[in-house]
Amino acid sequence: MAKIKPLVDTDIIIDALKGIKPARDLFRRQEIDVYCSILTRKELLSKKGLGSSEGRQIERMLSKVKILRIDNSIQQQFTNLLQKYGDRPEAVADYIIAATALAKNLPLLTRNRKHFEHIREITLSPVYKVE
């Protein structure tokens, strides 16, 4: 059986770190290879007031993830998205995440669906609900 390969947004990793079961289970399943953007790593580790214990916990979680660096294909997709959808400063990070999903042909798993629904080129994976 082929592995499931989602690109997770920062919120999914934060949920897993908080112990939210569907997110936590995602990182434990053998049939799933979890990917994230290098930007997600930066967002997690540059949190204001991040303590060393929390930083280690984040690094442990990230050790279970394939981190994708920004390469030429991602840069090209990012440029295409900016040209198509406009250059809004608040959306740059989202466009990098979307460009990564697009360039690597990975479905995006995020609870921040409103940030990505207008980008028709990417596939948004169904996501769990947090109560």
Residue ranges of predicted features:
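Nucleotide phosphate-binding site architecture
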Residues: 13-14, 45, 117, 125
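Generic structural signal for small/hydrophobic residues in well-ordered secondary structure
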Residues: 9-10, 44, 78, 101, ...
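Alpha-helix capping/helix-boundary segments
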Residues: 12-13, 40, 74, 96-97, ...
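Short, structured coil segments at secondary-structure junctions
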Residues: 30, 61-63, 119-120
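Acidic, metal-binding active-site segment of PIN/NYN-like and related structure-specific nucleases
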Residues: 98-131
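Short, well-structured N-terminal submotif of metal-dependent ribonuclease cores
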Residues: 1-36, 46-59, 131
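Active-site neighborhoods of divalent-metal-dependent phosphate/nucleic-acid chemistry enzymes
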Residues: 4, 67-111
